Regions:
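Core catalytic lobe of class I
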Residues: 2-104
Length: 104
């Protein structure tokens, strides 16, 4: 069985801790802000830019994978920031849901 560790907390703070400890990750799964100001919340004020994704890359082993969720209206900005930071965009997985259906 593989060994894994789930890290929860402020992303940049935790990433810098990993880098300082010379610990490298195989993959990153993240759901960053979509930049839609969801329900007027401060945490959804913008989309992480190039610098954010550069820091994430510094904590990754060569060949690591990144899975980042994004909103349909701002996904293009997220993807460009990731690519500008040096990540290779290989594939895009989309779940396009027009509306939530009621189950009887």
């Amino acid at each position: 069985m593989s060994k894994f560790k789930l890290i929860h907390g402020d992303c940049l703070e935790k990433t810098n801790t990993l880098i300082s400890a010379n610990m490298w990750v195989d993959s990153v799964v993240t759901d960053p802000p979509y930049g839609l100001k969801f329900m007027g919340k401060d945490w959804d004020h913008g989309i992480p830019g190039k610098h954010f994704w550069e820091v994430i890359m510094q904590a990754c082993k060569p060949g690591a994978h990144l899975l980042a969720f994004g909103g349909t209206r701002t996904f293009h900005r997220l993807t460009c920031a990731i690519e500008d930071a040096g990540w290779e965009i290989r594939d895009c997985i989309m779940w396009v849901r027009a509306r939530v259906s009621k189950i009887a």
